[in-house]
Amino acid sequence: MFDFLKDTNKRKLFIFNYCVFMINGMLALSVGSLLPFIRSARGIDYGFAGLIVSLHSVGNLVACFVAGALRAVIGKKKSILFFNLFFALSYLFIIFGKNPFWLAAAFFLTGVARGASSNFCNTEINSLAPGKAWIINGLHAMFSVGAFAFPIFLTILTANNADNWIIACYVMVGIGILSWILYLLMPIENDKVEKTEKGKGGLGFFAEPIFYLCTGTLFFYLCAEQGVIGWLITYFEDTGLLSASMSQLMASVLWIMILAGRLLTATLSTRIKKENLLVIMGLGIVFFYFLLINSTTTFWILAGIMGFGFSMAGIYPTTVSFSGGIIEKFPMAWSYILTIASLGSIIMPSIIGKIADKKGIGPGMASVAVVVLIDLVSIIGLVIYCKKKGEKVSI
């Protein structure tokens, strides 16, 4: 299983990729963690805050397409070095940018840097042990470590002085430079990407019901995921339900539970039918989200956060497994599923912001409850269809 680690270059590639993906987790969570401080310091309203969180998702999606095209032209290493420059640059924009344009550009660039790193690391790590789930699960576990570490770091930094959030931005500039150096030192083989057979499989997937069921399930899941991750801390602070430090810690708890949920789902998927597992997780996100937004005490808020994070952890990969057959038959299907589903993570933060501007952050976050209910309906529809059609679920 670990034979590739005997090769010095592959060992370096393994270690460096795991390190930069942990940093990528810090980058991803910094968006929601820093948002309350940025709103206060820059005097921005809920509507604009929702817009810049959405721009992070836009940047992430753009990177998925542009990074792939660029590495085919200039090579994988030069491509990732170019895109990773936006990591440090985005935080410099946050630090020194005093108008909304610079903030919008900063959040967009954090998404670009995150998306490019995600594409690169997943591809390179998979190349070390093709088809081995443990190496990809390990990579995403490192992402979760970075994700729950940043809110804790920010809490410690701002415990005595809220203005210290700006120091966290300077630290992220340094970490961004460190990640660029790690990419520079990576021994990348087969730097040029080979062109794949164009148009293989065609667009026949548009006639397949499972395409729409999988896409719908992922769309509403990503609506809920980015809506909660982007606005959770602001919701707790602005409603007065939790202190600033406790709000940051809740974000860390969410990601600890996502990590635990991913590990458990990977184990249970070999023992429990994925159809049943997906429905259980769908019911879980509905129950625990309703518990979360209706709770006013720390104990029940914590219970809601833990249950929601644990339940949502396996929905994305399990849903993707249902689409394995159509992706194998129509390779282009995955690009369309990913693109359409990702629109959910772009749209929802802005919707929450618009509602919060008019009615308050409470009703804004309550809108996510509608989304998780629709997602549950999509999940049930997907499972019923697959059982009727006798679809084989790829592992």
Could you say what each language-model-derived stretch is?
Residues 62-100:
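Conserved MFS/SLC helix-loop-helix module at the cytosolic interface between two early adjacent transmembrane helices
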Residues 43, 75, 96-101, 130, ...:
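Helix-breaking motifs and short loop linkers at transmembrane-helix boundaries and internal kinks
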Residues 31-32, 209-252, 256-259:
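Extracytoplasmic gate region of multi-pass secondary transporters
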Residues 106-141:
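Cytoplasmic helix-loop-helix junction between adjacent transmembrane helices
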Residues 132, 138-188:
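Helix-loop-helix hairpin linking two adjacent transmembrane segments in secondary transporters
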Residues 63-75, 261-273, 356-357:
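Helix-to-loop junctions at the C-terminal end of transmembrane segments
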Residues 272-319:
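C-terminal transmembrane helical hairpin of 12-TM major facilitator-type secondary transporters
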Residues 29, 56-65, 148, 255-263, ...:
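Residue-level signature of mid-helix packing/kink "hotspots" within the transmembrane helices
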